[in-house]
């Protein structure tokens, strides 16, 4: 039976979702809606979606199984709550909500309605992060002991013609990029117990440097540089730097340290790393390490490259929606679940609160560590 999806939000990101869903077996986008009906009609015509309509039409249509919620972050909670109250499953773009209480209300309503909530990011379901998880589960680096994530850009004003919301409440690098890294960490290392952080903003205003608004100034209302310490329930400790105030960097995007080795995600591009589904996974072990010897060993300049056995190594946005559709059929929770997204959001909320509180913040909402995808999971995008 086809899992029928109604799309709400027809912005730029919707294209890759629509294109991928058209290739997923058993999933069909049957209607699309936005605040602007003309925009909905244009999107439907562009992708041959059967119906363009209003948001209320999708919420009330009994033939639609799931709402794909690609609205702006401030609207995520409202659209998702309306969907579950109408008896529909929902899959939303990140973040799940912009307020902790909204997240609790949404998940409670979903449980009462007997429907599932899924949420981006789903990049951790891609081949790269499944490979990282395999290395950990197979004991290649031994018991994990630490993790470091480093992502710094200089914001979005050079390539996005309307970047204002990135610098308004609900935006900023923590909520924009943090979900990718924190979700990958939780997938690999389990839920987070507490955090401590410092934050700053380098500029009170930023200039838009592209498009029809080139040269216009916008106010910066959120912190744009965050440095966090993270303690996991397992005892692993880590750090995360995430910033819109960095012009360039050579730091790896993420490293996981274990008793017997290191896993490295070495991408120089700050919008790669945990933001993408594929890519190299490098590792070293006790036997191939460089810096534990004097004099330094010869012939160990290159890292070992892990073999990837999993699919989805291209831009696979919507993979979490496919897994949600299968979860409905199989009677289980989706891997990119609302509970996972809620935990990650509470972690980010604690990180945001910590600088003013000047102390560690406990994370009150835990979650299950998502299961890896089986190697046999069908790859519809290659």
Describe the role of every protein-language-model region.
Residues 123-219, 358:
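Predominantly a Rossmann-like dinucleotide-binding segment in NAD(P)-dependent oxidoreductases
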Residues 27-29, 64, 144, 192:
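Core-facing hydrophobic residues within beta-strands of well-ordered domains
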